[in-house]
C-alpha cells in the first residue's frame, strides 16, 4: 500500500452524493478514492440523508449504507469554536463546520474532496489540500 493510500480523505456532501448516485464525476471520484480511508463530520450524515430524501425515500438506505463505510467525527467544543470564528464571514455555516473538523483532525489528512466552488475556495483559504476528481 502506498503512503498516500494510508492517509485520510475528508469528503464533504457534494462529493459524498457522487459516491451514492451516478453523476458526471462519480466514476473518477470512485477511482480516486479506491481503498483510501474516508472521514467526515457528523454534519455529512444529516446532509446526506436529507439529500437522499429529496431524491426518493428509498434512496435513504443507499446513503446510510455508504455512511457506514466512513469514519465520522462528532462535533465538539473546539470544532464549534473554530467554525464560529472562521473567516471570511461569507463561509457558510455548515461548510465552516466541515472545514473546522478537517483542520482539527488528529490523523494524517491527505486532502479534502469537494465539488462545491465556495467550499473549495474556503478550504484553500484554510490551508487544506483540495481536490475534485473528474
Residue ranges of each PLM-predicted region?
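Acidic catalytic patch
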Residues: 68-89, 95-101
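Alpha-helix capping/helix-boundary segments
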Residues: 15-16, 44, 79, 98, ...
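Surface-exposed charge patches
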Residues: 65, 100, 121
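Short, well-structured N-terminal submotif of metal-dependent ribonuclease cores
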Residues: 1-40, 52-64, 128
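Acidic active-site catalytic centers that drive phospho-/nucleotidyl reactions
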Residues: 12, 95, 116
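His/Asp/Glu-enriched, well-ordered alpha-helical/loop segment
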Residues: 48
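Short coil/turn segments
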Residues: 21, 44, 88-91
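Acidic, PIN/NYN-like endoribonuclease modules and their adjacent C-terminal/linker elements
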Residues: 1-8, 41, 73, 104-134
Amino acid at each position: 500500500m502506498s503512503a498516500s493510500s494510508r492517509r485520510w480523505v475528508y469528503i464533504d456532501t457534494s462529493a459524498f452524493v457522487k459516491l451514492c448516485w451516478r453523476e458526471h464525476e462519480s466514476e473518477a471520484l470512485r477511482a480516486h478514492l479506491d481503498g483510501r480511508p474516508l472521514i467526515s463530520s457528523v454534519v455529512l450524515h444529516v446532509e446526506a440523508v436529507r439529500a437522499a430524501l429529496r431524491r426518493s425515500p428509498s434512496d435513504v438506505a443507499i446513503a446510510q449504507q455508504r455512511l457506514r463505510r466512513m469514519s465520522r467525527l462528532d462535533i465538539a467544543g473546539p470544532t464549534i469554536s473554530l467554525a464560529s470564528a472562521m473567516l471570511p464571514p461569507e463561509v457558510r455555516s455548515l461548510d465552516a463546520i466541515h472545514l473546522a473538523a478537517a483542520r482539527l483532525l488528529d490523523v494524517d489528512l491527505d486532502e479534502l474532496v469537494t465539488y462545491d466552488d465556495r467550499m473549495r475556495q474556503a478550504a484553500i483559504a484554510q490551508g487544506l489540500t483540495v481536490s475534485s476528481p473528474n
